[in-house]
UniProtKB/Swiss-Prot annotation:
Organism: Pectobacterium atrosepticum (strain SCRI 1043 / ATCC BAA-672) (Erwinia carotovora subsp. atroseptica)
Protein name (database record): tRNA-cytidine(32) 2-sulfurtransferase
CDD domains with a match to the protein in the record: TtcA-like
One BP term from GO: tRNA thio-modification
Assigned protein family: Belongs to the TtcA family.
Pathway: tRNA modification
Main location: cytoplasm
Entry function: Catalyzes the ATP-dependent 2-thiolation of cytidine in position 32 of tRNA, to form 2-thiocytidine (s(2)C32). The sulfur atoms are provided by the cysteine/cysteine desulfurase (IscS) system.
Keyword Protease: no
Length: 311
């Protein structure tokens, strides 16, 4: 076997391993939050970035082996930004045989007209885009709207709200839309951004740049992102532990009196969540909670959507 053949075999092995991990992560998120049900029509929001391309491929992959029937329709919003390559997504979606709809709305012109030069346009643009996507979901008869936010996005939002908003609030894997008419799901909620980056690079998706609008980047989010990436490098497993903490909330040991009835704690009240034992010095595990070395990925047999339970 030549050196090139050995290299290609190794690359294919690594890609298969990475795809299995992403499939497992997505399948577990779908099962944990009952994201997809029998007969669902999922509107997959496709921006042209690595996250949405990966989400679409993994959902299509799971669709083939799922114990339930559901359909997918990809939707892209062409906001008429200068330089937007209109041909890329239709060509890609035609090639892979996915049902899709391109929605053309000049939100770029609206934003430029309303927002002074030099100011960030993201907030207004996001509101306009959300409204259009909700309308499109209704027109297409979609029962769920799938967005491509991943685990790192969720953690970044948690820290943004803590640092700048004074709230212990993240980005939920599943929610009711603000118009009360649509269920929004985030199938990549358990997926690491670095896995998505590697997968997208290996798959050579036709990525569309996200800065065509010319808006200033969200500097606060970038600071948080850099902080988390630095932690991940210096303290492997810390990111997994923090995400695990979002899934293990103890209201009685926070300070939100609207969330827990502190006022009615009196003599004779039950001990809740260990009482003050929670503050005793504990032996911490050698490895952070929720963390496993990447080499152990093949140990899990969950590679299909067979973790899903129909409710």
């Amino acid at each position: 076997m030549s050196e090139n053949q050995q290299t290609n075999q190794k690359e294919q092995y690594n890609l298969n391993k990475l795809q299995k991990r992403l499939r497992r992560n997505v399948g577990e998120a779908i099962a944990d939050f009952n994201m997809i049900e029998e007969g669902d029509r999922i509107m997959v929001c496709l921006s042209g970035g690595k996250d949405s391309f990966t989400m679409l491929e993994i959902l299509r992959n799971l669709q083939q082996s799922a114990p339930i029937n559901f359909s997918l329709v990809a939707v892209n919003l062409d906001q008429k930004q200068p330089g937007f390559p209109e041909h890329i997504l239709p060509q890609y979606l035609d090639n892979i045989g996915v049902e899709y709809k391109i929605v053309e709305e000049n939100t770029y012109g609206i934003v430029k007209d309303k927002i002074p030069e030099g100011k960030t346009t993201c907030s207004l643009c996001s509101r306009l885009r959300r409204g259009i996507l909700y309308r499109t979901a209704t027109e297409l008869g979609a029962t769920k709207i799938a967005l491509g936010h991943h685990r790192d996005d969720i953690l970044q939002t948690l820290f943004l709200n803590m640092f700048y908003g004074g709230k212990l609030k993240g980005m939920p894997p599943k929610l009711m839309s603000d118009d009360g008419k649509h269920i929004v799901i985030r199938p990549l909620a358990y997926c690491r951004e670095k896995d998505i980056e590697r997968f997208a690079e290996a798959r050579q998706y036709p990525i569309i740049p996200c800065n065509l609008c010319g808006s200033q980047p969200n500097l606060q989010r970038q600071v948080i992102k850099d902080m988390l990436r630095d932690w991940d490098k210096r303290h492997p497993g810390r990111i997994e532990t923090m995400f695990s903490a979002m899934q293990n909330v103890v209201p009685s040991h926070l300070a939100d009196h609207a969330l827990f009835d502190f006022k009615n704690i009196r003599h004779g009240s039950d001990v809740v969540d260990g009482g003050d034992l929670a503050f005793d010095r504990e032996e911490l595990p050698l490895q952070p909670a929720g963390w496993q070395p990447e080499e152990d990925d093949d140990a899990s047999p969950i590679t299909r959507l067979d973790v899903l339970e129909i409710k």
